[in-house]
Amino acid sequence: MSTQPERAGLEASRLITVLANELKPVPPPQELRFGQSMTDHMLFASYDPVNGWSAPEIKPYGPFTLEPNSSCFQYGTSAFEGMKAYVGPDGEPRLFRPEMNIARFARSAARMSLPPFNPDELLKLIKALVAVEKRWIPAGKGYSLYIRPMIVAIGLLTSNTALLWVMCAPTGPYLKGGSQALSLLAMRDTVRAWPGGTGEYKVACNYGPTINPVQAALDKGYDQTLWLLGDKITEAGVMNVFIVLKRDDGGIDLITPPLDGTILPGVTRDSILALAAAHPARMTLPGLAPTTLLHPSERTMTMTELQAWLAEGRLLEMFSVGTAVVVQPIGNIGYDGKDIALPTFEGGRGPVGQALYERLTDIQDGRFEWEGWSVRCED
Amino acid sequence: MSTQPERAGLEASRLITVLANELKPVPPPQELRFGQSMTDHMLFASYDPVNGWSAPEIKPYGPFTLEPNSSCFQYGTSAFEGMKAYVGPDGEPRLFRPEMNIARFARSAARMSLPPFNPDELLKLIKALVAVEKRWIPAGKGYSLYIRPMIVAIGLLTSNTALLWVMCAPTGPYLKGGSQALSLLAMRDTVRAWPGGTGEYKVACNYGPTINPVQAALDKGYDQTLWLLGDKITEAGVMNVFIVLKRDDGGIDLITPPLDGTILPGVTRDSILALAAAHPARMTLPGLAPTTLLHPSERTMTMTELQAWLAEGRLLEMFSVGTAVVVQPIGNIGYDGKDIALPTFEGGRGPVGQALYERLTDIQDGRFEWEGWSVRCED
């Protein structure tokens, strides 16, 4: 269209900040429930196909008005992200590999036909928001400020009018039991993602259909679902999955399903693979012997294989990973009416999961410098 | 929960009607664009898990305010329906088999973990809304009032707080070209629905992911997509599909994919199957000889079969059906880089499609009484 070049981009330099007159009390860390206490402010911008992006605003968190025929209600046209800000020993707010989340956010938005934005500008804006909300970031291991960027189509189907906002909520450990091993119910009848579907994008449409099956798992006494595609293991709840296997050569395989379109390309997933690959040649993982060779790989894993590995005594650990949980051990899988008990460990995680958890949270909190993954919000 | 019995149901007897002070001008029928001119009023009710359903209201159509962390934005938790009101020769507004839409609406809502409602009460309320908006129903074949019931989760994921509303827009023939034959692009890479997915429900999540592939089809000069699952034909755009085949015994097969979980159980689909089964024993379809025996059936159909039927000269007609289009002929399928030309007919529809279209619209408009399918809004 001829108007395209004149449309404004999302520009951090146009940021308008209007602070709340009255600030809310920050709840004590132990009272935090995941994503339930929104901070004082949000980042907000709107897009229309004539003018492009509005000047972004940091403004008091609050409701907005939408037309009843907005396409997001009818067609689920929305994409989102989940990322975290941390405060480390220096008291400075930090983000963890935020460019990966923002790049995925842009891909998810494009998949849902939502308007494009400049990822670098959005990162600058998120840093500005986190700097404003710094007092909300709880200190302490397992605590952080959860950051939820969203982009949602409003107006009619073809209008390409959208709202983008970023909201924040302080958060403690994701699961009540801390690092206790999860008991998962493997789902055969409900399929989270399929070839040609949207499983590799972080779009609203992947989540609504999972609410009922997750509730069914809870009702049966499980903590979460294990998503299957036929016999293939794909994800656990909203997390990627890893299996740790003993090798014949004394080393350890660390495997996770490949990014075949049905798997969310998780930032934690990618980080786990990278950290495992770095041990021990480039860095020793805490608590793991430098002589223990880790062999990370992306490969298909099936329930049949899982049971065989278990029977052979090769399956050492299974865990799920994600921004919310970081590394969460899996101790049991309900499958075809029986429970498959996996190796469990005092304190929760097995040695490989624990080593990766420690190193990852050290990097996130700014206690260990690694490849620029932990990014300061204030220069 | 102990509070459950005290929660209010959706009750038509509690309806509060507040009419708009100023009514909008009704656009001339020829200027109507599908779903773009909302009428003066909407039906509205809200649900919370403590109080249940609010007293339903008919009130001026207008925006509402939502919290940025409403679950519909993050998880696509919404379901909807598409139905139509017609005015026939008697000038009375009518609905077409509305109980089927409302039953599907309740099933879709339940699939998305949205609160339950009494379908009979919702039907009473929709009739009341249509009666209020009677002046908006355009007269004439192919014209009607499109009715969009919606139910959307607001609030936090687990809060089960929801809004239900019904909005209306006058509408003319769905596709600009009237009954001209559609040219469809068969989609291999993007899959609309999958076993274990939500294809059989009318939920927002089924639609957002189709916007890009539909645009890709339009960009290549096609009118719509033909959805495949592997080699299987499933749906066309947002429509069910039928193929008409010549039988060796001189009769005619009318086939459509079975409701295996990947197919929306369309009201028009069901009506077409029923009308075909009634011909000629119980009723003669207009323009079809009583000696022409129709054999409707639900069976899997593949692209391989379609091409074989075409080569054998057995494929007489292919058409798509739905509330919006009623019966729309399909004249071409782009598949694996080539175009498959289907039989086309002067005026658009072939004899079987035309006969079914005529009888169905006669029933919808109240010109032909059939099994109580056309339901008056005012008693």
Residue ranges and their predicted role:
Chain A
Residues 1-129, 153-379:
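Helix-start/capping segments and mature chain N-termini
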Residues 129-132, 140:
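Internal, well-ordered alpha/beta segment that forms a basic, Gly-enriched binding/recognition surface
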Residues 137-152:
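Extended, Lys/Arg-enriched charged tracts that mediate electrostatic binding to polyanionic substrates
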